[in-house]
Regions:
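A bilobed periplasmic-binding-protein/Venus flytrap-type ligand-binding module shared by bacterial periplasmic
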Residues: 127-134, 173, 243-255, 274
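An extracytoplasmic/periplasmic, membrane-proximal ligand-sensing/linker region
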Residues: 178-182, 283-324
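A ligand-binding cleft/hinge motif common to bilobed small-molecule-binding domains
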Residues: 87-91, 211-230
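Bacterial N-terminal signal peptides that target proteins for export
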Residues: 1-11
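Extracytoplasmic ligand-binding site segments that recognize negatively charged/polar headgroups
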Residues: 34, 38-40, 76-209
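Early extracytoplasmic/lumenal segment of secretory-pathway proteins
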Residues: 27-91
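Mature extracytoplasmic/periplasmic domains
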Residues: 250-305
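Periplasmic-binding protein-like
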Residues: 111, 124, 184-188, 194-195, ...
Length: 324
């Protein structure tokens, strides 16, 4: 699945609108990031306070961030990229766009979440998000959402727009085999709706129009709970997948030393605490969090055989849900 070939429309306009800022702040570090805008601002503020180096931030969905990178190939602007999809880092490394760097602060990051060219900023997990006032029984397992009480009341993120959602499908397939596809078929027959990106899947549950999300990215829901929303995040005991958020330095960066220092800061104890405050799991195993961490979850084997296998799963799922 080529994430860089989607959502190019509009990226060029955004780039032109912001070009004056980029020129004015030629000595600033430029960070492109998907995910919580408040976290990006907090990390930028902490880094600026520590180093005196100004940080320009472009925050959007992963698709829009990637489209902007593509549009700027002739005149690259980004120094550091933080994506919500591990796939994007793998693809950019294959293209030769990344500057290898191993931060000394990455020693406490598990090996599964770092390479020579990129490292997790933080980690989210996928679960069931349930509206506690929906009048439905609390689900404990993925299969519970196929019960009659949930008929027509479940949403799921579109796996063609959410790499983490696709990871969950692959993880369930790896763990359950054909039983996973039987589960997906029952969910479809029970009226589960593919609702676009992660936020669009969650919104009708927050509004009470739907009862639950199958495969919701957790940190957004935890933030909503803090804001008073009547929802609950449930991680099935049978297992789930996690979504590490890769951070990388672009080879085209004109501020490589500052970019390395920014990565170091994000992976410092102070930076990782900011990640935890945004309801993500810190990448470092020695920094705590205020939500379930890796050790609290049973993880499904989410590895695939590469882009061809991912495309095959995506196509099969799309075909299943396109048929009446």
């Amino acid at each position: 699945m080529n994430v860089l070939n989607s959502m190019k429309t509009g990226a060029l306009l955004t780039m032109l609108l912001s070009s004056g800022m980029m020129i004015a702040d030629a000595q600033a570090l430029t960070v492109y990031t998907a995910g919580p805008g408040s976290l990006a601002k907090s990390l930028a503020t902490g880094y600026e306070k520590q180093t005196g180096v100004k940080v320009n931030i472009f925050q959007a969905t992963t698709g829009k961030v990637m489209a902007r990178l593509e549009a700027e190939q002739a005149n690259p602007q980004a120094d550091v990229l933080i994506s919500a999809s591990w796939d994007t880092a793998e693809e950019l490394e294959q293209r030769g766009w990344l500057l290898p760097y191993q931060s000394p602060n990455a020693k406490q990051v598990p090996a599964a979440f770092k390479t020579d060219a990129y490292v997790a900023q933080g980690i989210s997990a996928l679960g069931i998000v349930w509206n506690t006032g929906s009048g439905t029984p609390e689900p404990r397992e993925w299969n519970d959402l196929t019960r009659p009480e949930f008929k027509g009341r479940v949403t799921t993120p579109d796996p063609s727009l959410s790499g983490a959602s696709l990871d969950l499908l692959i993880g369930l397939q790896n763990s359950m085999g054909d039983d996973a596809w039987a589960l997906f078929s029952r969910l479809k027959m029970n009226g589960m709706v593919i609702a676009g990106p992660n936020a669009q899947a969650l919104t009708p549950v927050l509004q009470g129009a739907k009862a639950a999300v199958f495969g919701a990215v957790d940190y957004v829901s935890y933030s909503s709970i803090q804001d008073g929303e009547a929802i609950k995040v449930i991680f099935p005991a049978s297992g789930t997948v996690v979504a590490p958020r890769p951070m990388m330095i672009l080879k085209s960066s004109q501020h490589a030393a500052d970019a390395r220092a920014f990565v170091d800061y994000v992976l410092s104890e102070e930076g990782q605490q900011k990640v935890a405050d945004a309801w993500l799991m810190p990448a470092r195993s020695d920094v705590g969090g205020k939500r379930p961490l890796l050790r609290d979850l049973k993880l499904l084997p989410a590895q695939s055989g590469g882009s061809a296998d991912r495309s095959a799963v995506l196509q099969r799922f799309g075909t299943l849900f396109s048929h009446p």
